[in-house]
Amino acid sequence: MQFAVKENKGEKVMENNRASFGSNLGFLMAAVGSAVGLGNIWGFPYKMGMSGGFAFLLVYLVLAVLVGLAVMIGELTIGRKTGLSPVAAYRKLSKKFTWMGYMAVLVPFLVLCFYFVLGGMVMRYALGYLTAIFGWNTWNVADISEFFGTFILNGGQMILWTAIFIALNAFIVAAGVAEGIEKFCKIGMPALFIMLLIVIVYVAVQPGAMDGYKFMFGWNVEPLKEDFLKVLKTAAGQMFFSLSLGMGAMITYGSYLKKQESIQKNAVIIVICDTLVAIMAGMIVMPACYAFLGGETSSGPGLLFLSMQIVFDKMGYVGNIMGFLFYALVFIAAISSSFSLLEVITSFKVDQNVAEGKAPGRKKYAILAAVIVFVFCLPTCLDGLGAGTNGGATIGSPADILGMHWAEAGDISEFADGTNYYVKGDDGIYSKVDTAAVAFDASETYYLNTAKTWNVDWLDFYDMLSEGIMMPLGAMVMAFAIGWIWKIDMVVEECEASGHKFWGKTFFDICYKFITPIGMAFVLYAQITSYFG
C-alpha cells in the first residue's frame, strides 16, 4: 500500500497510507449510517405489516443476534485485517474466495440500481412537503393521493430526481472518507434520531395509535405456525438489507478502521442502533396506519409513499410539517446508505490502482461509478415500478425480456373461475378480459400472465438477485470460511489487536460453524423456491 496518494485535503490516513476515519465516533456514525437506510424506514414497516407484526419482529431480533452480529463482526474483521476493499481483501485471505469479493461489489451495484431511484423519490416528497409548509402546492394533482401513481409513470421526473440524488452521492464519495462520508454522517445521524423522536411523539398521541403498538408488540406467533419459512426468509432478507451485510460495505468501512478501535464493541453498537431505528420507524408507520388508515398495514412498498402521504394529508396543515420531517429523515437514511454502497464500487478501483502503483483516482472513479449505475437505473425509472398498462407491467420488464411474461391459455372451452385472461392487441399490448361481462369466444386466443413477483418490474428483479440470493449466499460462505477454514482464531486475533479482550468465543464459533451457514441455507432454499417454484 506504499503507493497510496492522499488526494483530498484533510483526508486522514493510517500507517499504511490508507484513508481512514478521523475518529471512532466518525466510523460509528458512518457505519450506522450505512446500516440505517431505506431498509429500516421503508422495508421494515411494510414487511412487518405483511408478515404478521410481532411474529416478524421476533424472528428478526433472533436473526440479528445469532446471524447479523456474527456476520457484522466477520466483515469488519476481514476489512481491517486486510486493509483492503472486498475483492482485494478476499484475494489476500485466499485466492479461492476472490469470487466472493467480486460478488460483494456486484451486490451494491445491483442494489443501487433501484436504491438511487427510491432516494430520488424521497427527495421529491421532502420538497413537496417543504414547499407546502409555505403555502406552495408543488404536487400538481387535484387529490394528493393521486400523486404517487402520476409520479412513478412520469419517466422524465423519475430520471431527473434520480440524477440529482446520484450527483449528491458522487459528490460525497469523491470528497473522501473523512472529508465527505464522515462529515456528513456526524451531522446526519443525530439529526435523523431527533426527527424520528419528534414524529414518533406526534403519532403516539393520535386516536387509534395504540392498536398499532399492539400489532407490533402484542404476542402473536400464529404467522410462524402458518408459514414459518416465509416469515424467516422475509426477516432474513430484511436483516441483511437493513444492516448492509453481504454488500461489501462493512468490509470497506472496516478497512478504514484504526487498529486501536474495538471491532466487537462497534459491531454491537451498529446492530443495536440499526435495530432501534427500524423499530422506531415501525412505531411511526404502524400506529399511523391504524390511526388514519383503519389498520391497513400490508400495502407493500407503496406504504412509504402512497399510504404515508395519505396519512399526512389527513393531519391537515401540521401534516406538512410532519411529512417534511419524515421524508427528510428518510432522505438522510437513504443517502447515508447509498453512498456507502457507491464507496464499495469506488474503492474497488482505487485499491486496484494503488496496487499497480498508480494514483488512486478517487474523484474520477466515484463519478464514473455513479454514471454507470445511473444507466442501469433507467429501466427502474421508466417501468413505473410495474404499474404500467401491459397487464400490470410495462413492456420491457424483465419478464418480457426473459420471455416469461405471457403464455397462451391453451385449448380451453370456457373461462375458469379465479383465472385472469388477457387478449393481445395489434399494438402488442395485453388487455385483461372482463370475464363477467364478455362471453367466451372459441376463435380468440387467450393469454395468461405468467410473470413472477421478482420479474414483473426492475426494482424487484434487482432486489431478487441482490437481497434475495447473493446476500444470504455471501453470508453463508463467509461464515463457513471463518468457522471451518480460517478459524475463529483469525477473528479473535484481529479483534484483540486493539487491546480489547474478545468475548463469547465459543458462541461465535458455533455461529460461524453451524447457526449462520445452516440458517442461511434454509433462507436460500425458501427464497429460490418462492422465486422459481
Residues covered by each model-derived region:
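Inter-helical loop and helix-membrane interface segments of multi-pass membrane transporters/permeases
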Residues: 15-18, 47-51, 84-103, 116-174, ...
